[in-house]
Regions:
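A membrane-cytosol interface segment of integral membrane proteins
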Residues: 144-203
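Extended hydrophobic-aromatic, low-complexity segments
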Residues: 117-119, 135-136, 167-168
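Short, surface-exposed loop/helix-turn segments at secondary-structure junctions
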Residues: 136-145
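Hydrophobic alpha-helical transmembrane segments
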Residues: 66-81
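Hydrophobic alpha-helical transmembrane segments of multipass integral membrane proteins
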Residues: 48-58, 77-88
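N-terminal membrane-targeting/pre-transmembrane regions
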Residues: 1-68, 174-180, 191
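Conserved beta-hairpin
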Residues: 84-130
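Residues that cap or initiate secondary-structure elements
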Residues: 114, 124, 132, 164, ...
Length: 203
């Protein structure tokens, strides 16, 4: 639990640094980045705004009702700013870990918690298809299909030539024949993927 919390904390601050100073992680030549934040952007925006308002509201409340407790104002301010930066870092963590398509393969990600590297030779086809999943979990498996959803949505289907094993956050998933995931611009991702696919199989 502590190790997981620490990894989250480090990842958020690194992502915040990369986003603030516009220093994205390098990618291979010919690769493109594709975001997947759009469905949850409004929610993240609300949390960030609320966190900022809370800082001011708590500071004013302490100043008004407990004017002699200067130390409490300082503590509350530090915690409030940390919480605000944490929320911004959460958004940055998604923005700085986009999906990638490039010469070496397709890379499907979900912040720093999931990173699937799929060589093109393992893929039969990549196609657009919008789906809404009833289960609200981000990572789902149903039979031989794995879904990486954002706000219960997926937009791209990846069909493998043969069953593969995917390294998921809760452990490896063997015998997977299809991966579904969300991306903000599925048509562009699929079009770029098609330029790398070898003898794509139509389905």
């Amino acid at each position: 639990m502590i190790k997981k919390a620490l990894s989250w904390e480090i990842a958020l601050w690194v992502s915040l640094y990369r986003l603030t100073f516009r220093r994205p992680a390098p990618i291979e030549e010919g690769a493109r980045r594709f975001g997947y934040v759009r469905p949850i952007a409004p929610v993240l925006g609300v949390f960030i705004v609320v966190s900022a308002i809370d800082i001011v509201a708590v500071d004013l409340a302490i100043h008004h009702f407990l004017p002699s407790w200067g130390w409490l104002r300082t503590v509350a301010l530090v915690l409030g700013v940390w919480g605000l930066l944490w929320m911004i870092g959460l958004a940055a963590n998604i923005l700085t870990h986009p999906h990638l398509t490039g010469p070496s393969g397709l890379r499907v990600r979900n912040s720093h918690t999931l990173d699937l590297v799929l060589p093109w030779e393992t893929i039969a086809t990549v196609r657009t298809r919008s789906r809404y999943l009833i289960d609200g979990a981000t990572v789902q498996r149903e039979g031989d299909v794995v879904s990486i959803a954002i706000s219960s949505l997926t937009a791209v289907d990846v069909v493998f030539r043969e069953p593969v094993t995917l390294a998921l956050p809760k452990g490896p998933a063997a015998g997977v024949t299809e991966l579904r995931f969300h991306v903000d611009d599925p048509e562009a991702l699929v079009a770029h993927a098609q330029t790398f696919l070898q003898d794509p199989v139509t389905a």
